[in-house]
Amino acid sequence: MKLDLLTSKWESAYEKFLEEGETSIFYHSNAFRRFLKRLLSVEDHYLIAVEGGKIVGALPAVLCRGKVGKCLNSLPFFGSNGGVVEFEGNKKVWQLLINGFFELGKSKECLSSNMISSPFAENPELDIDYDCLDKRIGQISDIRILTDKDSNNEIDHFGAFTRRMIRKARKNSIEVKVENEKNAFEFLKACHYENMDDINGKKKPEFFFHLVMDHFNEGKDYNLWMAYKGSRPVAALLIFYFNRTVEYYIPVIVKEYRSIQPLSLLIYEAMKDASKKGYYYWNWGGTHLDQPGVHRFKKQWNAVNIPYYYYIKVYDNHLFSYSEDLIRREFPYCYLLPFNELNT
């Protein structure tokens, strides 16, 4: 078994490998790899484990540059899950890839390397040489239960609070549909910026919204679900599809309509649609440990809690003396280390 880099020679074999296991996700895909390169102008260094001429494991990673140095992330951009992709729990494959990842960061003279594990991965017991550790709560709903056979009582699979929210949206005549046109994305962007301003949250860059339409295939790779009250758009939800999993990516809502719960109906209809198309899982993404309200909301959708981790190796101790503002400015979409580890 040897370690290699994913190049054009291996692209089709890599895509075939991802299809072999139901737990590979959107962030592992070739399409997302190319998307990150265009969006962030980063270098891709996807590691693959090859045995007998066949890919048996992978670890997606990209190299990010700032004025003060470089970092290696698996993966960057709002906590995109990377980590080891392997479907049989082969400890040798895992160890080869993880060691290769941290050695790559060292050889590239990075400030640090950060590997974000996938909540779907069943990690064998490994020796991981890291300096800092961060944790998130992954939450995943099994949506296979949402089929036409249960059309009369399918919302009963969810918590009482979620059922009330869905019924409230219906009672208020909220209508939902898929709209992948430019004007729908303009609404998504504007509402996303308003929502983030309200909570002082980090915004997706403007280029992101244009690039999604240009780079991915609508209906196959993504859908933008829209909710209307009469003729007015009041909520939207961007989701991505890959293999057996749907990624809950950008939810937005016009705040004066929050009380009638249009987003809950959007989520429900998008889940049903994905289930009918053969998808198994709805990945809510990571939740910080200090976000109990967000955690409870997802839990009411029958989501299972699966913790996952950020494994960070620091190569240059000067990093600990940098300010949080400097790191955020130079690496806006990368993760170098937990800020509570800084000396400043």
Predicted regions and their residues:
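A conserved beta-strand-loop-helix scaffold within acyl/acetyltransferase catalytic domains
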Residues: K2-G52, L59-G69, S118-S141, L146-S259
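Conserved acyl-donor/pantetheine-binding loop and adjacent beta-alpha core of acyl/acetyltransferases
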Residues: L63-G83
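Short loop/turn motifs at secondary-structure junctions
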Residues: E43, E109-L111, G278
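Active-site/acyl-donor-binding loops of N-acyltransferases
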Residues: Y46, L59, L63, K67, ...
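Acyl-group handling in specialized metabolite and lipid biosynthesis
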Residues: V84-E88, K149-N152
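Non-catalytic accessory segments adjacent to catalytic cores
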Residues: K92-G138
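Aromatic (often tryptophan-rich) hydrophobic motifs at membrane interfaces
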Residues: I48-L59, G79, F87-E103, H210-Y322
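Short catalytic-loop micro-motif centered on adjacent basic/acidic residues
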Residues: S112-N114, K177, Y281-G285
